[in-house]
Structures are given as C-alpha cells and as structure tokens.
C-alpha cells in the first residue's frame, strides 16, 4: 500500500496494475517471477553498450510487453481517467476537447496495445506455452506452436504505423498509456474460477453463468450477447478451458493439441474462421463470450484490484466501447 497520499501518480498506477496482473496470471506468480529473473540475468550479461541502451528496462519488472506508459506530459496525481478499448487519435482529440469543457482528465488509457507496446506486443504470446501446458498440452508441443505464432504475429505487426497515436498524445500534451494483458489476465482467471466453482454441465449452463454478469447483460442489450460458435446448448461441456489472455489467439494447430489433452469446450472472447473450422474438425465446443464485453470485464476487475491493493481512489470516464461497471 502506498501511504500518505490520496491518489497515485502515473508510475505508481502503472506498477500497481502490473502487480495486480501478476497476482492473477494464469501461469502463477512463481513462473512469472522466474521469467523476470531470467530477463534480469540476460540484461546483466549484455556487454555491448549499444545493445544495453536499446534494452527496454521495463521488461525487468513488467512481464507484459503490451502494457506501457506511452506518454507522460505531466507527472501528476491520477484522479480522473479517460478509458476505452481503442483510444486512438480521435479519442485523444476528444479528451482534449473534454478538458476544454473542464473534464480535468489526468490520464488516457487504451486497452488495446498502442505505440511501442504494440510494436512488440507479440512477446506476450510467449505466456501461452505455460498456459497450454497447464491445460494438458505437452510442453514441447505447446512451446513449438507458441513460437510459430509469435513469429507470425511479429511479421504481421512490423509494418504498422505504431507511434501515430502516441505522437498525437504528445502533441496534445496528454498522459497516455495502454493496458492489455494486465486486464485480460483478470477476466480469464475470474471466469476460470467461476466455471470451476459452478461446474457447468451443459453449454447452456455456461451461457447462463455469463449472462448473469453485468458486462454481458449490457452487451446483450446492444445485440452482442455471449453466443455458441460450435455446439448446441444441450451439448455437455466436458473439460472447459477459458482462453482470454496471452496477447493474441493461439496457433490454429494448438486446437488439435488441446483436443488430444481432453478439452471439450473453449470459452473465448473471439476466434477466427480458421480456428472455428478446426474446432469443428475436432468436435470442440466454442462459447464466444464477446470481445469488447470481456475486455470491459477485465478492465473493471483490474481497476477494482488496483483500488483494493493501493487503497487509493480514481474516477473512470468510459469511452470507445468500454462497458464500465463499478465492481
């Protein structure tokens, strides 16, 4: 707990978010801390000054490459946060406009990675090795398929205009950060624990559990409820795996490995057509909880965790599709 202050500054908020995410990392804190120790060892072994200067030192304490402070215009106490799923240049201009109307926004947060965090967000995919191993996939298979996916995503994001929105934040003199996996960890672990405790028998039971949560209720009002992408409501769920964190969707070939490990149902935010076709091939049921609603649940749980851990308060102004629920 940070004492003697009513509010957090940006760095304190950032580090609290990371610590809260490690608390609920599906791999477990021990594996994450070992990863950080290995990164520190690699950093200490670098003798080339140029390479050392290029090293992102946030990696020494932050295992989530898709979560970063993108711009600090003014290091101030964070009382009011303007947060959304995709807070890009348009939303940054909106933030500036709202401040002209005395909104007093101290920090803009985008959930999906942006800036230099987006340029290397594929590094987060590495956590899928341990995640899928814990779900019963042989470690050598999980590692090989995860490395294949990392390589593919790295190539796909390489040509993007990564710093477009970060530069806009700088020009508008706005504090700006992205929080991706730190939020996604929360929704995956929360739903995993919910399903473990309730032990749903059929797919209809899983849908009922999701539809009882406020974020999914609100999404349903906007015609985007949890849905079945494979299987019927009467299907028995079998072994259920919630897959909602790890940067991006796993490699399509991982579906065969999950089927071989006995997985009967996947609960996901979203899946590509190729993933869905592969699930059909191996008779894996798919419960699609919803992308933006699941992202929103993760953010809501994260903000709750930060407040509980730090004993500090902050106000949220939701935008860009973010379904804010004060949990």
Language-model features and meaning:
Residues 1-327:
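Active-site catalytic microenvironments in core metabolic enzymes, especially phosphate/sugar-handling
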